Amino acid sequence: MKRGCAIAVMICGLITSVSAASAADLIVQEPVFEPLPQPALAGWYLRGDIGYNFKSKTGGKWNFWNQFEEPYRGVDDTFNYDDFSLKGGASYGVGVGYRFNDMLRTDLTLDYFRASINGRTNCPSYVKSSHGLNPVEDNCHYEDNSKASVWTAMANAYVDLPRVGPLTPYLGAGIGAAYVKYDTWKTSEICPTCTLQSDKDGFDSWRFAMALMAGVSYDLTDQLKLDLGYRYLRVNGGNAYGYDEQDRQVINQYGQGAGADGPQAKDNGFNIHTVRAGLRYEFR
């Protein structure tokens, strides 16, 4: 009897062992994944851009200098330009920046462009009369032509929006200064009997500037980005050119008196719309 019980216990133990082993075989171990190293999001970057500035209409005003003797000598009138525009052209820029996180970055940029500028104004009625023209007809006008070189130094901040695959849209804004330098201005009086041609020294000045940006960057690699964007740049107004040699003379064909000095014309500033493409390299 005891021998039979022992055999029964051994059989039960064997069955239990086999059942436990089979159950263990059915348990699937979940794989353990090691977290991938994340690229460093903070760090410095360099950028370079080229762009195209579209034609920009603006405004301006100029003083008419009376060359006759005292008490008539001096500024008779101030006239607004009927048309005053900055032509389109290429722009170039470089910059250095710093990324704080995956949303916020800032940079300092230096940009340059050069463009022709043209102004047109109808002659005053008394000038038309002096040429024997009908003073109320559109038969006489002035044309002013020059070129402007514009440098901008800007401090910018950007917000990178959520990524869509390799694309990262962004919005930005900047403030800074613009250095505007005009070449010599050439003025022509246009009418059937007009002969006036004069050169006027262009002025240069520092001005306040602000910008708004929007665009998208494309990941060429994890460090190199292709940047496509739009920028609106506002440059405040300033002096454009001085008086010609005849106006500056103390003695002329009409008599003697103080010569003209200082700026004769001022522009109202520029609203410049630019499309740009560039590369941005981020150090990691």
Curated annotation (Swiss-Prot):
Name of the protein: Uncharacterized protein BRA0921/BS1330_II0913
Keyword annotations from UniProtKB, A to Z: Signal
Signal peptide (from-to): 1-23
Superkingdom in the source lineage: Bacteria
Gene3D superfamilies named in the record: 2.40.160.20
Family under the similarity heading: Belongs to the surface antigen msp4 family.
SUPFAM superfamilies according to UniProt: OMPA-like (SSF56925)
Source organism: Brucella suis biovar 1 (strain 1330)
